[in-house]
Structures are given as C-alpha cells and as structure tokens.
Amino acid sequence: MYNIKRVNLLGKRFYEVDGFGVFPSVTTVLSTTGDKSGIERWKKRVGQDEAERIAREATDRGSVMHKHLEIYLGQDLKQDKQSLLKSSKEQAVADTEINSFNNKAKDLGEDLFMKFYNNDNFFPSIESTIFQEKFLWFNKSNLGYAGTVDNFSLLKDGSRKVIDFKTAKKPKQDNWIMDYKLQVSAYSIAIWQRHGIKPDGGEIWIANEIDDVPQKFVLSFEEIRFFFELFMQRLKRFEEIKREAEAAGVNI
C-alpha cells in the first residue's frame, strides 16, 4: 500500500506518491493545456458569478450521479435489475456523500443515473466491476501523472474496459470530447503499468439533461494508444508551463 497525499502546487492539484514522486492530476494537465477561449467567452457573456453558480451545480449533479453509479455497480451484478436498483437506492438514501448535497443536486443526479438504468445499452453490458474509484499513477522517463478512474469492468463480451462517466446539459458531438478520450486513455495505460492488466478499450458514458437516452462513445485499444500519445504531448506542454511558472514565482 502506497502513501498518497493530495497537494496544491502553483494553484493546481497534484498527488504525492510516497517513493515515486509528485504528479499532476490528469484533469490538471488537461485543464491547464486546453483551449480556454470558448469558456472565457461564455464567462464574459453570462458574468463571473453566474458562471461560478452554473459550474458548481454541474459539479454537484455530477458527483451525485457518480455516487449512484458507484453504489449500483459495486453490487453483485448477477442479481436481477429490480433488486439491484432497490438495494442501491436504499444505500443511496443513507449515503453521507449524497446527503451532503442540496435537494436539487440530489434529484438531478439521481435522474441522470436513472437514464443509464432505463436503457439496456449500459448496465446489462457489464459482467462485473474489477475496480472503481481507483487511484492510479503513471511515470516514465521523468514524466508522470495521477488520478482516479471511475470504473474498470469485465464486460459480457469478455473484454476489459475503462468506463468514464460524464454529465452534460445537452448531447455531445464526437469532436467535442477530445479531452474525455485523452483522460480515458491516460487511465487505461496507467492501469496497464500499475496493475499489469492491458485494457481492451474504453467507453465514455454521457447522460445529458435533454435526452432520455445517454450517449456511449467507444474506444478501441488502438485508439487508446493513439490518444495516449496525444495526452503525453499535453503532459510535456504542462511541464513546460510548470517550469515557467516556477521560474516566475507565479501560479499556473
């Protein structure tokens, strides 16, 4: 068991892994190196206070949905779906993390979870959960990163896949989710390095507030390798930004 500590450096989230080093989180790498022009235009249009409120609500609903998914998929999935739902709802009612949110976030997060439950393209494809909410890190040639993967499961077709859960206000187009693909790829390769298990691919599940049917984007292992190389380019750029900030004595 490794001693892991979350630390704040240069205004960003890093993880200190005892004996290995200090690594930026995957989300820190992506948020720092991504194109922020669209977000900045949106903030200017709606105002800073409104932007913060919307972002906070999105984070809260996502946290609630993630917890419902974690509870549901942490059960013996060989049970019938009605029994699984009954048990998971009983656990959710008593869950301290879910109960820390306001009723609006709890209701919306549960509604988004139920969209996955009500569509047979999602839970029925999973044979069993290998692990979920697992801390991972990767390091090679003085480059490294860390983060927590949502879910890694054995599917009924025999494949093992990283599954990442997302929420959205409206449906996503494939060309809008590049960072999601990079994130799944980073976690997949970290699983391979840390646990010696080569994932067969990845999936991105997105529940949005408009459609009853969530979206599923599927990545092959060949695509994961491709996107991992792109992620490593972003990681190298992040390290350049970090060095510049350290030299200037400012936050990233």
List the model feature ranges, each with a label.
Residues M1-A146:
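Metal-dependent nuclease catalytic cores that hydrolyze phosphodiester bonds in DNA/RNA
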Residues I130-E244:
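Mg2+/Mn2+-dependent nuclease catalytic core
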